Amino acid sequence: MPTELRDFLMLPYGELEELNLEAKEQRKNRVAADKLQEQRLKYLSDESRIKAVTVLFSDLEGRLHMLDYDKKFLLKSADNLTFDGSSIRGFTPQRESDLRLKLDWGAFYWGPADIFGPGKVLVFGDVLDRDGSPFSADIRGVLKKLSSDQYEQNGYTLNAANEIEGFVFAGVDAEQTFHQTGKFDYVNTGGYYHSLPGDPLRTFIDTVA
């Protein structure tokens, strides 16, 4: 008899890779947005093991923001998602805080359950102003329009990707004790070139990779 109350989606990494590469191929082939929307909505409706959809967008500084929506709610309200833009630095003043999210079904991803939690999928959203026009501070949206214009006008395909850089601090919850210690301790002061097998930094790199 199973001990879990619900059977939420948890895909192995190999299957995640296959699904995400298939979605990437659709983007590469410029499959029509309405066709992608139809496919994704049907998938969400049919896949009973998905409980929530994480909608992502980025701010002016490139910081990633995530909003979790109950799947059933999102299926009914996919065209009417809003959020408070005044809570995002550089977006809107409080008196004009309402912004909208238009789901970019081409940017639909299956994420690892051990990172994002079981039963979830990810999709990026384009930020829209209150009148439905593209929001000028949505840098991802600006880049999408530039890329689309270059393809339509000149036949150019623009490729962009993020470069992951950062610092690894000791302690899983290091930020929660910063107000007491006033500092962060690095996991390793020698850099990743000098990290040996089994040390904390190398273990972190191997786990993430």
Annotate each language-model stretch with its function.
Residues 1-209:
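ATP/Mg2+-dependent ligation/transfer catalytic cores
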